[in-house]
Amino acid sequence: MTTFYTVVSWLVILGYWILIAGVTLRILMKRRAVPSAMAWLLIIYILPLVGIIAYLSFGELHLGKRRAERARAMWPSTAKWLNDLKACKHIFAEENSSVASSLFKLCERRQGIAGVKGNQLQLLTDSDDVMQALIRDIQLARHNIEMVFYIWQPGGMADQVAESLMAAARRGIHCRLMLDSAGSVAFFRSPWAAMMRNAGIEVVEALKVNLMRVFLRRMDLRQHRKMVMIDNYIAYTGSMNMVDPRFFKQDAGVGQWVDLMARMEGPVATAMGIVYSCDWEIETGKRILPPPPDVNIMPFEQASGHTIHTIASGPGFPEDLIHQALLTAAYSAREYLIMTTPYFVPSDDLLHAICTAAQRGVDVSIILPRKNDSMLVGWASRAFFTELLAAGVKIYQFEGGLLHTKSVLVDGELSLVGTVNLDMRSLWLNFEITLVIDDAGFGGDLAAVQDDYISRSRLLDARLWVKRPLWQRITERLFYFFSPLL
């Protein structure tokens, strides 16, 4: 009996080391950033079983077998649709400003189509204004409405949007709603999901959380886009979820969320529609390619309309494009660069680009919330402050709530707005969307919004920052080490 237990013990030990070695080899063989690999190895060696389970659950990009097959199957028809769209030559821009030229060339070469022109844009910075405008557009819809949000939180004006959407479905408008399973858990536990389906709305729970399949699909891969398309002509996107800030996370201690949304009319709605159709097919298997844009761009629209490139990220879309776009934007800056983000955990490349811009004389400002709803990200972001301040970057800490706006403005003319946070999860993991806008008028509007944020912020003093307590520095470095995983 003693011999039996000895053999079993040795087999368990051998199996343990084989498992550790196998996971280590798998991490090393994957194409990933060195800091990310080192962070995973440290976790696995310090907490072996917990680390291995965490890595198998969250360490690799698993879309799931069924979704991966759908993504492969949809590409030929999507590619044909994009090729056919090129026949609508009147919607594509032929020239761009000098500051936007490099970025638009990058987007065109990687996505296969140029930016679209003749769009009319309106920036909305108040949640009530966003929802009232959306309700009006829903009430005037004639054919179809498509929506996708990371979070839909019942309560307040979000319920009025839901009521207007159900009324539209009852009068014959084809309504589709896709919500992330994790982000919108409160919605799916409420009566609203059943009420909407009973009204005729197609409601899809995207990337459904299922602990029984935790090793078959990455659970923290999330549908993070916020988009609305109406009649293939009106579109919304930005940082705002379908929540009323007065009812959302009131016990988080960070104040009301502050967001920005863009309301658009024009061909950009078609570009966003193809992104939505891909998401819908990956999730449901149903193909809903949008029709070509039924618009004739008049001369005055061509002269005054905004030129926009739509960049989507996530499985099935050009890899690393949003990250490349941010790098290109930073390196294109000549006068000033302003960034706003709630979560700041940049890649080494992006951090280097931001610091280099400041060191070559560009006026660089980053606006972050003073209080963050994520303790981990809050501490990790502080670990980058010393290097940024040393390079001459201005760091503004917003004190008017949780600044949730994601925006970049370069030289007053090139703008990026959308759903992308400046962290690893948004840059390389989630389904995200960003608009790249080449227009000085829109840039002026965005600059006014960012100036308002700065007026409600405190400029971080580099002299005081270096005097912070030792325990804070240690905590920052600890979270900095694990920043590639956040």
Curated annotation (Swiss-Prot):
GO biological process terms, semicolon-separated: cardiolipin biosynthetic process
Gene3D superfamilies: Endonuclease Chain A (3.30.870.10)
GO MF entries: cardiolipin synthase activity
Membrane topology: Multi-pass membrane protein
GO cellular component: plasma membrane
NCBIfam families the record matches: bac_cardiolipin
Protein's cellular compartments: Cell inner membrane
This protein's UniProt keywords: Cell inner membrane, Cell membrane, Lipid biosynthesis, Lipid metabolism, Membrane, Phospholipid biosynthesis, Phospholipid metabolism, Repeat, Transferase, Transmembrane, Transmembrane helix
Top-tier EC class: transferase
The family this protein is said to belong to: Belongs to the phospholipase D family. Cardiolipin synthase subfamily. ClsA sub-subfamily.
Domain named PLD phosphodiesterase: residues: 219-246, 399-426
Catalytic activity: 2 a 1,2-diacyl-sn-glycero-3-phospho-(1'-sn-glycerol) = a cardiolipin + glycerol
Gene (UniProt): clsA
Name listed for the protein in its UniProt record: Cardiolipin synthase A
Parts of the chain that traverse the membrane: 3-23, 38-58
Job description of the protein: Catalyzes the reversible phosphatidyl group transfer from one phosphatidylglycerol molecule to another to form cardiolipin (CL) (diphosphatidylglycerol) and glycerol.
SMART domains (UniProt xref): PLDc
Coarse class of the protein's main subcellular location: membrane
Active site as annotated: 224, 226, 231, 404, 406, 411
EC number: 2.7.8.-
Lineage, top ranks: Bacteria, Pseudomonadati, Pseudomonadota, Gammaproteobacteria, Enterobacterales
